[in-house]
Swiss-Prot record:
Keywords: Arsenical resistance, DNA-binding, Plasmid, Transcription, Transcription regulation. GO terms for biological process: response to arsenic-containing substance. PROSITE patterns: HTH_ARSR_2. CDD domains: HTH_ARSR. This is Putative arsenical resistance operon repressor ArsR2. Transmembrane segments: none annotated.
Length: 119
């Protein structure tokens, strides 16, 4: 939409084509981007799905055997998911176990709903 200037060349605010954009909470946006970025990698996303689909915490040793990447890559991926608040971890003996957070459960359920695959 082209706006016409008044006789003195100044645009009238009432002629604006749309409302100004709303404010964005920069802290919330940074948190959202951290979460989405953590999910935006094939290995991390697969690990997250496997952890969320397990009945109980998943041992890192079991995850390493299922995703087809090095132990180092799995460790880095799990660390990133933990830092983003998508998984919790606990240590039992020499092993770490990972579980999804409530945030993860809601996000994955929402994605399933959007695809129409909610179980």
């Amino acid at each position: 939409m082209v706006q016409d200037a008044t006789a003195d060349g100044v645009m009238d605010a009432s002629d604006a084509c749309c409302a100004p954009p709303g404010n964005v909470d920069s802290d919330a946006m940074a948190t959202d981007l951290q979460v989405l970025s953590a999910m935006g990698n094939d290995t991390r996303y697969e690990l997250l799905r496997r952890i969320a689909n397990a009945d109980d915490g998943v041992c890192v040793c079991d995850l390493e055997a299922t995703v087809g990447v090095s132990q180092s890559a799995v460790s880095q991926a799990l660390s990133r998911l933990y830092t983003a608040g998508l998984v919790t971890r606990r240590k039992e003996g020499s092993w770490r176990y990972y579980e999804p957070t409530e945030t993860t459960e809601v996000l994955l359920e929402t994605l399933d709903d959007l695809r129409g695959n909610h179980e």
